[in-house]
UniProtKB/Swiss-Prot annotation:
<dbReference type="Pfam" id="PF13920">
    <property type="entry name" value="zf-C3HC4_3"/>
</dbReference>
<keyword id="KW-0862">Zinc</keyword>
<dbReference type="Pfam" id="PF16041">
    <property type="entry name" value="APD1-4_M"/>
</dbReference>
<keyword id="KW-0926">Vacuole</keyword>
<keyword id="KW-0812">Transmembrane</keyword>
<dbReference type="InterPro" id="IPR013083">
    <property type="entry name" value="Znf_RING/FYVE/PHD"/>
</dbReference>
<dbReference type="GO" id="GO:0016567">
    <property type="term" value="P:protein ubiquitination"/>
</dbReference>
<keyword id="KW-0479">Metal-binding</keyword>
<dbReference type="GO" id="GO:0000278">
    <property type="term" value="P:mitotic cell cycle"/>
</dbReference>
<keyword id="KW-0472">Membrane</keyword>
<dbReference type="GO" id="GO:0008270">
    <property type="term" value="F:zinc ion binding"/>
</dbReference>
<dbReference type="InterPro" id="IPR032008">
    <property type="entry name" value="APD1-4_N"/>
</dbReference>
<dbReference type="InterPro" id="IPR001841">
    <property type="entry name" value="Znf_RING"/>
</dbReference>
<keyword id="KW-0808">Transferase</keyword>
<feature type="zinc finger region" description="RING-type">
    <location>
        <begin position="390"/>
        <end position="429"/>
    </location>
</feature>
<protein>
    <recommendedName>
        <fullName>E3 ubiquitin-protein ligase APD1</fullName>
        <ecNumber>2.3.2.27</ecNumber>
    </recommendedName>
</protein>
<dbReference type="GO" id="GO:0009555">
    <property type="term" value="P:pollen development"/>
</dbReference>
Length: 441
């Protein structure tokens, strides 16, 4: 009676296991084992590699989400401080200034007179922008004694379309001074008057001597500072006659009026309705001197609910974008794995047709990881021989290389099959143009 074969004899009688393509195509044994582990994770019921890749996408998008949210808060802060932060404005006689805040971001406007001295200021509220079509003519004369290397100046607030006619006389004869008109009400720094490049950056610069006239047209509503500078080594006297044709806003259609009885006025903006505020100063003929001036401050109370809603909308938009990004990248990763698996199946099927390996393709998928570990566990000659075998079929030596990359990882038959199926090198993923056989002499 025949005795049962021992397990050791069965191991020698069985054919060598069929190994499939590994994800890693490195020639080292450790890289081959890692590739087999990747395949095991790919074909399991729970795809751990897809899950971990999606988690990495979510983690990176979380950083992007935090950065974008920080940028939004920073932009909101800049919007509040620059557009709707406190602003100081100087007003002279026969002036008017228009302020149009957004009813979405601004709840109310507070106008306060900082150096309250003369009455006459008026605040008007409108549903829409009033017409800029009221013309007022007024004039002033100034005699300035300017010492050497100094200047004198004063501000105006002028609306677009206003005209300035400046008639001048400089004494003594032969003396020259600079007549500068620049945007702003802070004056002209003494240090920049000697800079030749300053004249190209200022709104209007003229070197005047003797007698003459200069006409200026205002194209932007703003504060302007007029200065007369003497950079010579002797004192001069300058006579100026300034005729102003000012353009003011029409206040007849206003629905709100405040006369600054206590030095300040507050205008409550209405939501989803246009809001405009005009502050006017009295004319010089109404008991007001040409030298009278008002220094006022505009301050805004923000509408907090608008910023809260805006932040919520930004967060929702970013969450939706991140969700679409995750789905796109994860679904793209799954499709790529499926394509590689199908390519491996076709390669192994071609090898099975040649009779060089045993077992079905399904069996090889089920047992390739265990066989690979057993195969790569051998040392010495077997390990060196495995480095020279085809990384696809492990049956014949590597006898080809790919053009143009030059990698050599398979036999000529497997390389030709890869070129026909996928067409890309498994090492660098570059497109293969040719598969060249290596002949051994």
């Amino acid at each position: 009676m025949d005795s049962a074969p021992s397990p050791s004899s069965l191991d020698f009688e069985l054919s060598p296991p069929v190994l499939v393509t590994m994800t890693s195509t490195s020639s080292s044994a450790s890289d081959n084992v890692e590739g087999a582990d990747d395949d095991a994770n790919t074909h399991g019921i729970f795809n751990w590699r897809d899950f971990s890749s999606c988690w990495r996408v979510s983690e990176s998008n979380l950083y992007c989400f935090s950065l974008a949210l920080l940028i939004w808060f920073f932009a909101s802060f800049i919007l509040i401080e620059n557009l709707y932060g406190p602003k100081n404005v100087w007003l002279g006689p026969s002036s008017s200034i228009l302020v149009e805040p957004s009813s979405i971001f601004v709840k109310s406007i507070k106008v306060k007179v900082l150096d309250y001295s003369e009455p006459g200021l008026q605040l008007y509220g409108f549903y829409r922008t009033p017409a800029l079509d009221c013309f007022v003519n007024w004039s002033e004369s100034r005699v300035l004694s300017i010492s050497h290397e100094s200047y004198k100046g004063w501000p105006y607030y002028l609306n677009s379309g206003s005209l300035l006619n400046i008639t001048y006389t400089v004494k003594p004869q032969g003396s020259a001074v600079q007549l500068v008109v620049d945007e702003g009400h802070q004056g002209v720094p003494q240090s920049v008057l000697n800079d030749p490049a300053y004249r190209y950056n200022v709104w209007s610069w003229n070197l005047i001597e003797g007698s003459g006239m200069i006409q200026l047209e205002i194209r932007k509503s703003s504060s302007y500072y007029l200065a007369v500078a003497n950079l010579k080594s002797k004192d001069v006297e300058v006579e100026l006659n300034i005729d102003v044709k000012a353009v003011l806003y029409d206040t007849k259609q206003s629905f709100y009026n405040c006369n600054f009885s206590n030095g300040e006025c507050t205008f409550n903006a209405m939501s989803l309705v246009g809001n405009s505020v005009v502050v006017t100063s009295p004319a010089a003929s109404q008991g007001v001197s040409i030298e009278d001036e008002w220094y006022i401050r505009f301050s805004y109370q923000p509408r907090e609910i608008a910023y809260v809603i805006g932040t919520g909308v930004v967060i929702c938009f970013m969450l939706v974008a991140i969700q679409f990004c995750n789905r796109f990248q994860c679904s793209g990763g799954e499709g790529h794995l499926t394509e590689d698996d199908s390519a491996r199946t076709r390669l192994l099927a071609d090898k099975d047709d040649d009779g060089s390996s045993m077992g079905s393709c399904d069996d090889s998928y089920a047992n390739d990881d265990a066989d690979l570990e057993e195969f790569m566990g051998n040392d010495g000659e077997a390990s060196n021989r495995s480095r020279r075998l085809c990384a696809i079929c492990f049956d014949v030596p590597r006898d080809c290389f790919f053009l143009p990359c030059g990698h050599s990882v398979s036999c000529y038959e497997c390389g030709t099959t890869m070129q026909e199926a996928d067409g890309s090198c498994p090492i660098c993923r570059r497109k293969m143009k040719k598969v060249k056989r290596i002949y051994t002499v």
